Amino acid sequence: CGISAMADAQVTESLKAIGMENIRCAQTPGVTTVSFENNVYRSTYTGVGKAIDACLGSKTKGDLQLVVLENRIPRLCINLPDTLTEAYRNGEISLIQVYQQMGITVDTDAAMKALKNAGQEEVPSAWKVDLMIYPDLFLENNTFDELYTYAINLNPAVEMALWKGGKMTAQVILPVATNLSGEMKRIRPGIIALSQDVRFRHNIFGKMTVGNFTNNRYGAQLEIKYRTNN
């Protein structure tokens, strides 16, 4: 138990050190299961790669399975058998070879069950506010007297993670340059919305969004997706 607790703490601290959030770790016979959320690296793949590298640097025993969260909803499960982790730690294979040989699936049910009694999340993202800036470039060629109509905007947004799957977004559009007139030259609201993600069993995902969308559209949007295990 002491060794397992030490390994859990080491994995958790390694993930904290690279900025991961919503971290949980649990030991079951022969398997270390870890869940985390990447809100640091803009590329999901970069974030996952950093997390794998951090976990491989920890002294886990047995197989290693990582659950990748998005807005605290499980999205992917990455499986690294003990033969693979030991080969990497012994210098027999490279990190690239680990990526090539590890298993990836959308089916996270078993892994999340293993984390059921893992306790509170470390570095929770709930009620955390992020300030994002999105560049926006619009080009259109539909007139004979001008080569292009264009608009360049900066769209700062405040994004707040709420409860599990819940998110609030408030965005403003700041025009930088344009040859259009009217509203396109004015500061105006962008996306102001509240969304809720849900994961059902058997890889079915749902998302409901209500609020103000682009182009002055108000309303609600419902998405349902199914993903195969691969």
Functional labels for PLM-detected ranges:
Residues 1, 152-162, 187-200, 218-230:
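Feature captures outer-membrane beta-barrel proteins of Gram-negative bacteria and organelles
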Residues 1, 33-38, 131-143, 168-176, ...:
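Transmembrane beta-strand segments that form the barrel wall of outer-membrane beta-barrel proteins
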Residues 12-35:
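Short edge beta-strands and adjacent turn/loop segments
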Residues 42-44, 142-150, 164, 175-188, ...:
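Solvent-exposed loop/turn segments connecting transmembrane beta-strands
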Residues 43-63:
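Short, non-transmembrane amphipathic alpha-helical segments
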Residues 56-84:
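A short amphipathic beta-strand at an alpha->beta junction
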Residues 93-129:
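Outer-membrane beta-barrel biogenesis signature
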Residues 122-180:
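Core alpha-helical transmembrane segments of integral membrane proteins
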